[in-house]
Amino acid sequence: MPRSEADTIRILVSTDNHVGYAERHPVRKDDSWRTFDEIMQIAKKQDVDMVLLGGDLFHENKPSRKSMYQVMRSLRKHCLGMKPCELEFLSDAAEVFEGAFPFVNYEDPDINVAIPVFSIHGNHDDPSGDGHYCSLDLLQAAGLVNYFGRVPEADNIHVKPILLQKGRTKMALYGLSNVRDERMHRTFRDNKVRFYRPNQQKNDWFNLLALHQNHYAHTRTSYVAENMLPDFMDLVIWGHEHECLIDPVRNPETGFHVMQPGSSVATSLVPGEAVPKHVAILNITGRKFEVDKIPLKTVRPFVTREIVLASDKRFKGLDKQNNRHEITKRLMVIVNEMIEEANAEWRAVHAEDDDMDEDMEPPLPLVRLKVDYTAPDGARYEVENPHRFSNRFTGKVANHNDVVRFHCNTKGKKNVATAPGVREDIAEILESADTIKVDNLVQEFFAQQSLKILPQAPFSDAVNQFVSKDDKHAVEMFVIESLSTQVKELLQLDDDKIVDLDAHIQDFRQVMEKSFDAGQHKQAQRTKRFKRKPDGWDSDLDGHWINQPQALEDIPAEVEPKGNDRPTKRVPTSGVTFSDEDEDMDMDNQPVPIRAAPKRGAAAKTTAAAKKAAPGKKAAPAKKAAPAKKAAPAKKAPARGRKKKTPFVDSDEEEEEDYPEDDDEEEEEADEEEEDVIMEDDEEDPPAPPPKPKATSRVASTRASARATPVRATPARATQARLRLRRPPKPGLLARRLG
């Protein structure tokens, strides 16, 4: 197909931006967000159709307000505008996007999006905590990012594409967000990863996959091999690896190309980070693509070098006593050479800038010198303290605390992991012996003392979230959820059938363990979402769309595909299952189970306190005022009327029970405050109207609310039972009370 602008999809590709990295460093605090802003400027200047981010947009799971502000500022400044987006969205948005707004942002009539941004999450900004939200959920709710590639169940992954078309070019965009590498490797091995393909003209689609996993085998199972991915892919954008290998490389076994854009900011001073940083402009026309590399100019220059004193001619003859001063002097010369090299590289990158000032000074570079000071037999190299040596370059480098790294191979010490004859599995264990994992610590703890009520596997996961993701409420929410679930299960048992309560608790704990191991234990999901606003809706005349009852709809429960119900064309050996059947891309015809309305427990009973309460609001007795102080206003008690319907149903709110107030306690408080009561109203309260019957199912309640016309409730009249007035008493009344 000949290339033309009308048929070419232009995509800016970037991964691992790590906004917020070293934001408390006095020199490097603004490096990450400045480079991300440059990337968004490039997207606008190059007039691309979309931006694809491959994970780790933020460096932390809970980014700071500064980081979130800078990202939202860049996205709003460079990606919003009046330019129409030429990409035609062909997918069912409800299948690829989740959340309150299940549609692509550039089709939202309330937002003018010129350059849509599509992103998956990485291992640094992954979802966690109550509700299973991440920072990308906030950006999606703000209409700035299209968050796709979610993995609700790590042991049963379904990857559905975003179908886009421009002219005659069709693209299927697949997203696979980060999952712990060992678990992802096991899921691929067990053929539990299923990729869906378009059911029409599947040979006309350009298949693009973005994923965020280890690319290389750090250990036996802590990576995803390229041959595990489906061979119908045309290009794979590989995130998580920070070395910039922007040129696509073809895999001869699978036939697709792999591009590794790398990070846009150096987060570790290793040789892979010293490779010049780039972003790519991907031009797709039909089934062919081209890549244009664009260097990033706001990246801080970085130079690394490694020397061995025993083999370096500049340090010949210094392997003797009292040689520290001379070694330090010659090492300082090498570091100064590296600083000049870094500054020269920065000037070369900015040589073609028309707006660059000749007197402009380059930023302080990053310099890392690794020194092996292992001496021959009978000799010795004396080196200076690395921190003291690094501080000599304060004001010359950005990393003035860790410029040099000294290491020495101790005599007689051998690397057992790399010794010949050592089995591969034993070497793997020896290499990871110094790595302490939270999961291992929890398992060792439970091996000595077992749990009776709480399940062990979810407990270990909650502790891992607390330590790794800084989720301060992970353990608390786990305990509350586990105990409440077990209490509900025990209350459903018949009293005459309960023989051994401990046995029931043990059985249910094992059920929760198996559910978690099978990947069925998930966070509470949202059950309602907003419909798309009709084209003819006028907010000024008809009111805000989100305030209308018909704007809400139930989120259909996803039906798990069964292995025997959907035969596939073939079962690939790569550990991936994909399907070409028509029903695989059409999930709307599946039956949706109807959940019964939760019981309200004690709230369904009529109590004495409920009889006193008015239909609308209830006045609470005023607090007892301290002497010589002005009486405090009465505290407003919670309303006893019908609870206002919210857009989302929280599982905690569904199970919350309303308990009647204890009238005896109110009477006792009134007796204690008798000395402060001047006048009392003995008028009896009018009886409350009978309670309205409740809906028997959630579906019925939803349909009823959709048909009903919203009417503002009139404020209910409440009679105050006891009036505590602070006006001076009448002389006659006071005399009768004293008499």
From Swiss-Prot:
Region ranges (Disordered): 516-739
Predominant subcellular localization, coarse grouping: nucleus
Biased composition (Low complexity): 599-636, 694-722
Matching InterPro entries: Calcineurin-like_PHP_ApaH (IPR004843), Metallo-depent_PP-like (IPR029052), Mre11 (IPR003701), Mre11_capping_dom (IPR038487), Mre11_DNA-bd (IPR007281), Mre11_N (IPR041796)
Domain of life: Eukaryota
Biased composition, class Basic and acidic residues, residue ranges: 559-568
Keyword Hydrolase set for record: yes
Composition bias, Acidic residues: 650-686
Similarity-based family: Belongs to the MRE11/RAD32 family.
NCBIfam families: mre11
Oligomeric and partner information: Component of the MRN complex composed of two heterodimers RAD50 and MRE11 associated with a single NBS1.
Function: Core component of the MRN complex, which plays a central role in double-strand break (DSB) repair, DNA recombination, maintenance of telomere integrity and meiosis. The MRN complex is involved in the repair of DNA double-strand breaks (DSBs) via homologous recombination (HR), an error-free mechanism which primarily occurs during S and G2 phases. The complex (1) mediates the end resection of damaged DNA, which generates proper single-stranded DNA, a key initial steps in HR, and is (2) required for the recruitment of other repair factors and efficient activation of ATM and ATR upon DNA damage.
Protein's name according to its UniProt entry: Double-strand break repair protein mus-23
Organism per entry: Neurospora crassa (strain ATCC 24698 / 74-OR23-1A / CBS 708.71 / DSM 1257 / FGSC 987)
